[in-house]
């Protein structure tokens, strides 16, 4: 199935200077014209939004991020600020938020580290160090423990094989190792799961999953669920899901953020902002297929006001 890509594309007939003037006008004097802010920023892609920030500073002599933060509030502010933050920096800030203060947002750590490409992860590491003067690995080590810590450290290194090569003998060995690591009567050899799932390329892993099913008569997901627990289990399952179908993984993240009472706004905002340009069309398709309703209708029913307006534009339409 061919990937459909993102909902946010570069706007044509784009003028950063004109957009900067429109934004200033929307925030000047009493009150704020939220609709004008949405109409400028939502249809632009990330690099165009960066050009607008530069134009705003050079033509108006003020910082766009500061102005938006002082004029807006709540979840709407968080979406807009996320949209004008460079992509890698946005991930870095989310990782930082997930480990700051008491408590850890394990779901956020898993989502970012399991879904980003090795190249993206290397950029995240460099930016984290520059931004906060500490390595991402250090912070993960001080904030997590045991096998969960080890899987995050392993993922964050961005060392996954990026090729497509399939070594048949190694593939069979990996499947056998995972089977034995889990089916051993005296407990689970978690390191084997970690080694295979964090370092092998996607093509290799998809074959490993098939071979594992052939020898164990169950899906790798079932094996992971019966042999591991807690955040370590969540991380391994996320890796498997991202390898099988990344857009379905994000569809599930969005569904879980909105189903039932209350909304997990952190997850909803992060996925909508970070995937709009990459694979939002594919996420929408997966969402409809998995849950029988459109992502658009879920967002519409779960949010309100300007927050809803901007998320629906990022969503890009109903299905």
Swiss-Prot record:
Residues modified as N6-acetyllysine: 213, 293, 300
Modified positions (Phosphothreonine) in chain numbering: 7
Annexin repeats: 14-85, 86-157, 169-241, 245-316
Major place of residence: membrane
Modified residues (Phosphoserine): 12
One protein family per Pfam: Annexin
Record keywords: Acetylation, Annexin, Calcium, Calcium/phospholipid-binding, Cytoplasmic vesicle, Membrane, Phosphoprotein, Repeat
Subcellular location: Zymogen granule membrane
Membrane topology label: Peripheral membrane protein
InterPro entries (UniProt xref): Annexin (IPR001464), Annexin_repeat (IPR018502), Annexin_repeat_CS (IPR018252), Annexin_sf (IPR037104), ANX4 (IPR002391)
Signal peptide annotation: none
Role: Calcium/phospholipid-binding protein which promotes membrane fusion and is involved in exocytosis.
Entry protein name: Annexin A4
Organism per entry: Canis lupus familiaris (Dog)
């Amino acid at each position: 199935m061919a990937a459909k890509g993102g909902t946010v594309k570069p706007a044509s007939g784009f003028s950063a200077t004109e957009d900067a003037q429109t934004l200033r006008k929307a925030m000047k004097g009493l009150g704020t014209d939220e609709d004008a802010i949405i109409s400028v920023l939502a249809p632009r892609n990330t690099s165009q939004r960066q050009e607008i920030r530069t134009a705003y500073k050079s033509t108006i002599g003020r910082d766009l991020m500061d102005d938006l933060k002082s004029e807006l509030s709540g979840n709407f502010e968080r979406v807009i600020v996320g949209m004008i933050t460079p992509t890698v920096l946005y991930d870095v800030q989310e990782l930082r938020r997930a480990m700051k203060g008491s408590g850890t947002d394990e779901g956020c750590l898993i989502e970012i580290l399991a879904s980003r490409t090795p190249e993206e992860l290397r950029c995240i590491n460099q930016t984290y160090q520059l931004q906060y003067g500490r390595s991402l690995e250090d912070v993960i080590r001080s904030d997590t423990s045991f096998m969960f810590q080890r899987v995050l450290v392993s993922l964050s290194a961005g060392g996954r094989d990026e090729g497509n090569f399939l070594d048949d003998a190694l593939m069979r060995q990996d499947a056998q190792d995972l089977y034995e690591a889990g089916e051993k009567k005296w407990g689970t050899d978690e390191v084997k799961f970690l080694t295979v799932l964090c370092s092998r390329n996607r093509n290799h892993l998809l074959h490993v999953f098939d071979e594992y099913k052939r020898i164990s008569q169950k899906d790798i997901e079932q094996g992971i669920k019966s042999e591991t627990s807690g955040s370590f289990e969540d991380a391994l399952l996320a890796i498997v899901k991202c390898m099988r179908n990344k857009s379905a993984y994000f569809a599930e993240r969005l569904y879980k953020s909105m189903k039932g009472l209350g909304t997990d706004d952190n997850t909803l905002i992060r996925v909508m902002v970070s995937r709009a340009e990459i694979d939002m069309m594919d996420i929408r398709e997966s969402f409809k297929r998995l849950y029988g309703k459109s992502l658009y209708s879920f967002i519409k029913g779960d949010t309100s006001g300007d927050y809803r307006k901007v998320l629906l534009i990022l969503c890009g339409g109903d299905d």
